[in-house]
Amino acid sequence: VGRSPTAEQEDMHAAVEQAHAAGVAACLPGRAAVTIDAAARLVLRERGLEDRFTHGLGHGVGLEIHEAPAVSSRATGTIQANMTITVEPGVYLPGQGGVRIEDTLVVADAGPRALTTGGTGLRVVGL
């Protein structure tokens, strides 16, 4: 943001971080992709930000970066063990910017395993 974040920006980041955690936790074999999206979307709805989340939660990753299954509010597929998917909730304010937190996961019986992680917490860097 080019300066210290405002309280609104910090709240927006915290909401997206919580939505990300909910989406990751929901990534279990046999789970409907729409249910995974709904877990993250519920967090944003409770924070009054659902209308600012304008895309699906994620997608499969394989030979191409964007593959099936879609993980969205319109998804029809089911997540299976050993699938590689992204979880990437975001909230955007027109003319101001937004926050997106994205990780790539392998779906496993014991729970999702992160292949990437941006870490947690808001990091403010100087310009």
Model-inferred region functions:
Residues 1-127:
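Active-site neighborhoods and metal-handling regions in enzymes and metal-associated proteins
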